[in-house]
């Protein structure tokens, strides 16, 4: 039996409201706020999978994010919608650098145990070993590179005392992060927010450096300093320098769109094929989601595909997901 741990989806629209698309290449866009088709599909799957394996799911967002969820009918995915992230607008946290600051802020609002799960990641099986406590995250990533430079080279313009924590591990990818120790949760959340606040001045480092440090270096460093057990969901290791994976596949554990986003922007003609993959995976595992998908206005362009995948699954089962990997 899997340990019951509630999860949060976090959607801070601050980056959009600052004129920034929610992707790592920082391409500007105009127009109303919205989530791309593929992210809506993974969001639906993410909420249903977590609920099936581990427990309830809440959305922590702001007024714009809550309005969007309601307009799309996605509010039905959640036990509760909390607009606490409106308070981020009053803080000196630059959304152009800290596009995921909502996750750190949300971690201040709940006591452990709970998980923060990105809307572009869904589980395919329960997360193992949650009863052991500690801090669980998606996977390790290499450090000592342009994304994760040595700690002394990271911009720290607010003067946060980083010597309090032990930076002797790789970076912890936090597309899924499970906080099972409340001391770790509280100290990490405060440290992450303190690092981000007032820390947006000029620097020779890549823009991504500050956001990744605020989460994926600080969280494991705090765990190490407290003696809190930390471990990845998968032993698969992301080598930042070569953008390659090392180690066993995580396909049986979770699916994460992140590494496909750049390809989908570069080759938009691939998006319908990826939608089919996501739809087959979702509708095979959670067939009851089909009616919700057909009711979401932002999914209108793939409504015929939803119907076709439902028919194909009913006729002969899945054709893609059994042999596909993330």
Walk through the language-model features, giving the residues of each.
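A short acidic (Asp/Glu
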Residues: 20, 68-72, 126-128, 218-222, ...
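A conserved donor-nucleotide-binding helix/loop in the catalytic core
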Residues: 37-40, 44-45, 87-117
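Short glycine/proline-enriched coil/turn segments at helix->beta-strand junctions
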Residues: 52-56, 107-114, 131-134
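Hydrophobic/aromatic residue at the end of a short beta strand that borders the catalytic acidic motif
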Residues: 117, 123-124
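Conserved donor-nucleotide/metal-binding helix-loop-beta segment in metal-dependent transferases, i.e.
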Residues: 124-156
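Catalytic core and acceptor-binding pocket of nucleotide-sugar-dependent glycosyltransferases
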Residues: 166-263
């Amino acid at each position: 039996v899997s340990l019951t741990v509630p999860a949060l989806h976090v959607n801070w629209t601050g980056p959009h409201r600052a004129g920034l698309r929610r992707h790592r290449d920082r391409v500007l866009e105009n127009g109303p706020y919205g989530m791309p088709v593929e992210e809506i599909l993974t969001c639906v799957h993410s909420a249903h999978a977590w609920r099936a394996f581990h427990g309830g799911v809440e959305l922590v967002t702001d007024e714009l994010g809550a309005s969007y969820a309601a307009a799309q009918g996605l509010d039905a995915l959640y036990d509760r919608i909390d607009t606490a992230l409106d308070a981020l607008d009053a803080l000196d946290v630059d959304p152009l650098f800290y596009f995921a600051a909502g996750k750190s802020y949300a971690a201040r609002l709940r006591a452990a145990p709970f998980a923060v799960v990105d809307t572009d990641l869904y589980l395919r099986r329960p997360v193992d070993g949650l009863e052991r406590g500690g801090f669980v995250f998606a996977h390790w990533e290499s450090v000592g590179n342009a994304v994760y430079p040595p700690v002394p080279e990271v911009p720290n313009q607010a003067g946060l005392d980083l010597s309090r924590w032990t930076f002797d591990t790789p970076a912890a990818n936090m597309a899924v992060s499970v906080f099972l120790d409340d001391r770790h949760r509280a100290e990490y959340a405060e440290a992450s927010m303190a690092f981000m606040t007032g820390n947006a001045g000029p620097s020779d480092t890549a823009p991504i450096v500050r956001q990744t440090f605020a989460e994926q270096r600080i969280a494991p460093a705090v765990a190490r300093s407290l003696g809190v057990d930390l471990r990845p969901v998968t032993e698969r290791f992301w080598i930042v320098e070569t953008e390659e994976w090392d180690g066993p596949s995580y396909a049986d554990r979770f699916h994460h769109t992140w590494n496909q986003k750049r390809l989908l922007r570069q080759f938009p003609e691939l998006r319908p094929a990826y939608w089919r993959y996501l739809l087959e995976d979702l509708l095979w595992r959670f067939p009851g989601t089909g009616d919700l998908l057909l009711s979401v206005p932002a999914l209108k362009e793939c409504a015929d595909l939803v119907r076709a995948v439902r028919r194909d699954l009913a006729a002969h089962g899945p054709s893609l997901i059994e042999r596909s990997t993330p």
